[in-house]
Amino acid sequence: MDVFLPEVGFLALLLSLGVNVLTPLTAFAGVRLRWPAMMRLTCIGILAQFALLLLAFGVLTYCFLISDFSVIYVAQHSYSLLSWELKLAAVWGGHEGSLLLWVLLLSAWSALFAWHYRQQTDPLFPLTLAVLSLMLAALLLFVVLWSDPFVRIFPPAIEGRDLNPMLQHPGLIFHPPLLYLGYGGLMVAASVALASLLRGEFDGACARICWRWALPGWSALTAGIILGSWWAYCELGWGGWWFWDPVENASLLPWLSATALLHSLSLTRQREIFRHWSLLLAIVTLMLSLLGTLIVRSGILVSVHAFALDNVRAVPLFSLFALISLASLALYGWRARDGGPVVRFSGLSREMLILATLLLFCAVLLIVLVGTLYPMIYGLLGWGRLSVGAPYFNRATLPFGLLMLVVIVLATFVSGKRVQLPALVAHAGVLLFAAGIVVSSVSRQEISLNLQPGQQVTLAGYTFRFERLDLQAKGNYTSEKAIVALFDHQQRIGELMPERRFYEARRQQMMEPSIRWNGIHDWYAVMGEKTGADRYAFRLYVQSGVRWIWGGGLLMIARAQVVDTWQFANPQQQQQALNIASQLRCPQCQNQNLLESNAPVAVSMRHQVYSMVAEGKNEVEIIGWMTERYGDFVRYNPPLTGQTLVLWALPVVLLLLMALILWRVRAKR
């Protein structure tokens, strides 16, 4: 059976492609004909294509685990002596496997969306699935035609070429899946926005759904970027955590637009303002997620992460990016309506601060985008070769970063009557992140020198003593490991063990840094080439605060896990808001008020009530506004009007009738 497994995997890819081509047809037909059965068939199609992709990915993973070197992709990226963890990481260690992983995770997001809303009849949901299915079909077409991971080689290779040594690190087991998980969640949010355009309206309820899927996608992308930064710090031996590499920037760009999107959606879902901001940022996030794939997979930009330049793949990748981007922008231009109510902002209102945040994020995004692509544009224009590195990005983005910190402080302390715990957690993470950057940059000290066993050097008050060199042989490599003792005022506080590894299969040498840390300080050692008899080159670093950078990132992610509460400085206002919310009905629920329901529209309306209470509006004004917008149905207590006179008069009439009956009975006696 194992003989035909790769063919089974490829067949599953073909079937999934076919399902994704047919699924949008059922969605559009169901919406147009208002046929619920066709809409449910759309959900079934999404679940079926996910099952097929899961089968294909499972087959590829099994081929790696059993070292099936008859598959070219396995032979190029695996080795029989690799541990099973590294064999698993090798599945997405090359172009074909990583692209299949991305498609699988996007498919998983789509299946989760389909399952979650399988009972809904609103056209928004099948239209969202149709948009997702179209993107999956386009990506699968590229996989089948230009990136098939199941291509055979005959006769089979005797041994594999091994996984790239740079990728043989725990961080790389989780870094790519988290990035692709983030891209997938953000693409679902963008698909909701595009589906709302197809439906004809992007309102607060749509924004709430969009926000609900963008937030976990943003969290996964943030975690992936943090993990990638940690990998670069631990693996590349430069003592830094961010190098403004084109592929690093490729993941930063959608993160910037997604962060701006979340801020914009926070107002759209509550007050239905900034609609165009939210729609455009959702589309831009989709485009930048695709652009990142184009940069990494085509090799058009020089990077330590990118794959080799491949014109055969670059052209269809660019065509795919252009097709989806232009179609999304064209849909926005065709279907976008007015931007909602006209609202005037005061000088330091929440709305004005969020607008400033959006402008700052867009400015940084534009700087990073132009700086990343400019060397390629420079070369295409025939002007020669140009390098745009860290000095440019640091100087160009610094003033905008400082302004962001000012806005965060203002948003935290000048927001007035309401304070949201998730925002406080996220902004605390940003401040800790900024503190880590400043402290690590100011405190960093380094030295490069040659040492023999027994020699020592003092740096930043700490003594590094090269004690001995150990030789080791492990699975797929041999290594020379230096034992460097670390002293603080003559007291031994630990050891550093930098290595030089040689990977036989690839005939490649790698330097493995060694790091010791205590929460505040980092001690970092890299062993270089042999420069004489028992003499080796070393680079040593001491710096503080670098862990705060990743801690700040984790706090930002924790923001997504905090219960979305709303606290008021005035307890009376909080009680008033809860009282009003309890009097309003969720329009889509079975007899639940806004406090009892967690439906997207109910949460959006609840936040609207809280916002209006915080602005000083009274109960009559808020209930009147809700009634005008949603109709009398939204009120648990129907208003006293001519149409409801019978309803309200009935209890009074019955009481009078009962009193009359009792009086007559008593009179007869």
Residue ranges, per PLM feature:
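Solvent-exposed, non-transmembrane regions of integral membrane proteins
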Residues: 2-561
